[in-house]
């Protein structure tokens, strides 16, 4: 009889532990990876002019809440480099490398497939969509241009090389610092209980025109990025 009581007690304990494990609602996560960005603008009227993708670094921390069933909402803070290369390959070719740094605040909604890591261990897949606000913290440019593109210049067409940091206090190009965008992506991960590991892909599309006065140019100019990350998460309660 004692063995029966002991078995029942152990059963209740196991159920209690399982219930406790399935009660997770919050998790914090950290991730880092590579961003590949380009300036999305119309250069069809400019002969042999291109904007090309350049890789950058991204890192983020955030929190996520399991709202109901498989649905979760998350937010965080993220650093992302949106770098790209401008090239003119005409007779007097020149180029500029743009290193653009942003701090952004993303908000996303995701849906877990296969397994819900808040309730069970195993492989999970999470498609997600969201929006973000970002602040343009700094821009560094490096490149060269031919002297003969300067008005009134007469000479041998030699090049000027430059390596500068943009002065946002003067903001001579009237760049917009507060920007908004949308993103969509997918994460694949594995839950070990409290700990999750994951890899993810996100496409980030800029809603905001990069200049303060869009009327000053008829061309659309936005920064778009593809981001690949690896991350870990820890469930709190």
Please describe what each predicted stretch is.
Residues 38-54, 81-103, 135-179, 207-229:
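Extracellular/periplasm-exposed beta-strand and loop segments of Gram-negative cell-envelope proteins
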Residues 97-139, 143:
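Hydrophobic, well-structured mid-protein blocks that either form specific transmembrane helices
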Residues 30-34, 57-65, 77-79, 105-111, ...:
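Residues on the lipid-exposed face of transmembrane beta-strands in outer-membrane beta-barrel proteins
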Residues 189-212:
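Extended, basic/helix-rich recognition subdomains
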Residues 54-58, 68-72, 100-106, 124-126, ...:
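Short connector loops at helix/strand junctions that flank enzyme active sites
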Residues 20-60:
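Short glycine/proline- and aromatic-enriched beta-strand/turn motifs that initiate or cap beta-hairpins
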Residues 1-27, 228-237:
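Bacterial Sec-dependent N-terminal signal peptides
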Residues 20-26, 69-70, 114-124, 140, ...:
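Short loop/turn motifs that connect adjacent beta-strands in outer-membrane beta-barrel proteins
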